[in-house]
Amino acid sequence: MSSVKSGKSWIRQPIVVVLGHVDHGKTTLLDKIRGTAVAKKEPGEITQHVGASIVPASVLRKVAEPLKKYFPKLKIEIPGLLFVDTPGHELFSNLRRRGGSVADIAILVVDIMEGFQPQTWESIQILKERKVPFIVAANKIDRIPGWKPNHDQPFLETIRKQDPRIVSRLEELIYRLISQLYEAGFMAERFDRVKDFRTTVAIVPVSAKTGEGVPELLALLTGLVQRFMKKRLVTSEEPAKGVVLEVKEEPGLGTTIDVIIYDGVIRRGDTIVVGGKDKPIVTKVRALLMPRPLQDMRAHEGKFVSVEQVVAATGVKISAPDLDNALAGSPIFVVPSEDKIEEYIKIVKEEIESVRIKTDNIGVVVKADTLGTLEAVVEALKRENIPVRLADVGPVSKNDVLEASVSKNHRPEYGVIIAFNVKILPEAEEYAARENVKIFRHNVIYKLIEDYIGWVKQLREQEKIKELESLIRPGKIRILPGYIFRRSNPAIVGVEVIGGVIKPGYPLMRKDGMRLGTIMQIRDRDNVLKEARAGQSVAISIRGRILVGRHVDEGDILYTDIPKQHVHLWLTKYKNELSDDEKMVLKEIIEIKKKQDPFYGLVFGS
């Protein structure tokens, strides 16, 4: 393990993350990069950290050698690149740091044949929010029909060996990516055509399978961080700052935390403050553990080797007492002296409270497995303008269901629990079933939000259908001469529907606005109908103070008697739900009713 560099400060390795849609080749690309590092490293150089892999400067120099003729000024000044081993933005979310990310730069992997997919867009959104610069690896160029693979060669070499038709197809696919990036708010170009890397996202065509283009990818990452991030990469012998990637049970060690240290030094015996579920945890480092190099791996010695200290940037496992409640995604600080403990507790507490939400607002309840994923889910909901009532880390409890049911009583669409990668406690499950509180669970953020939005759409559609069903529609009928079957109690007459619709339960009125009674039943010979529309002739029974011959007669025109609030909804919210003949009938009804109430059918602010 590297010891503290001479002098007080040094340039550390930049921390690189790999993001992208499922099956676009993130893991294959990381494996390729790791394999390159292992194959080309100097004897004794360590490439494997906890949760991360190093591509040392010596490897970067070897990989970049064939590119010298294209980029003569390329010099390697950084000590290497630190790649976070687990790809995807769920883990990237845990690399959180107030106002940004611990990651210095990202590779966005896109399958060149498929282009942008839901998680590509989501990754870009998260990179934007966390202000992390990125380059695009346009992966799977070997899948372009007719492509001749040249293993591990630079892209600029392999492209010269391809048929012109294949080159032109590649250009089309790159152009599609440029358009999609433009849609996401970024200027982009193939890496060798970029004039200004500060304003343009570079696209590197690669094949994670054959290794083509990987030399340029590594060289470009190196060049960009050296040119634009040197200040950010300066670290010193100060007490370490880091972030918890994962909390893990290890046989013989108990609960440990896998940490990325991005600044300073951490030593065995140091006092650390780390975020906990209930409160910040103050503890002492019992052991700093690094993976045992593969060649030394002996079954009885275990997977890890203990070291005295590590310096940034590094991935390390920390064994210490009282880590059971540690939170992934929380900051970790080495406390410089005992009198500073309270100060660091306050910093960690504020950091965690900035992500947790507890309000009296009407909104959804969010539960996630780590602080980072919690923040990412809440951000994704905010983008969709979905309010959050409560957001916390941990399994779904009965109390969460209680909170959701409060929202449900006010706004049914917000009375739900959005659960990312967490368990639902049995009592919570029972209570949710009893209270009819829906729980959405998924381990992919965009799917979780997608499922919820789809459900809300359905719910609104159902509510709309229900409300529309409850509204009295415009209807106009004429009593057919010779079809008076019964004069009263109830009156039964044959009618023709001239316009609109009539249904059982609809009140009827005369042309002068006088209420006659309510339709009880509609029949067509022996069939009882749910409704009758324009053009139909049917028999209807009317209950009310109606006597045919006195109040109405053969040939009379009757209308549905629509309440004022129903008319308001027909003229505003549901105006597109009426057919043309219903609209005509509604106009006539408004004219009749206006004589009794001048405000009937008046829409204010229109």
UniProtKB/Swiss-Prot annotation:
One of its GO terms (molecular function) is GTPase activity. GTP binds at residues 20-27, 85-89, 139-142. Residues 85-88 are annotated as: G3. Residues 207-209 are annotated as: G5. The keyword Nucleotide-binding applies. InterPro entries: EFTu-like_2 (IPR004161), EFTU-type (IPR029459), P-loop_NTPase (IPR027417), Small_GTP-bd (IPR005225), T_Tr_GTP-bd_dom (IPR000795), TF_aIF-2_arc (IPR004544), TIF_IF2 (IPR015760), TIF_IF2_dom3 (IPR023115). NCBIfam families: aIF-2, PRK04004.1, PRK14845.1, small_GTP. Function in general translation initiation by promoting the binding of the formylmethionine-tRNA to ribosomes. Seems to function along with eIF-2. This is Probable translation initiation factor IF-2. The lineage of its organism: Archaea, Thermoproteota, Thermoprotei, Desulfurococcales, Desulfurococcaceae. The gene is infB.
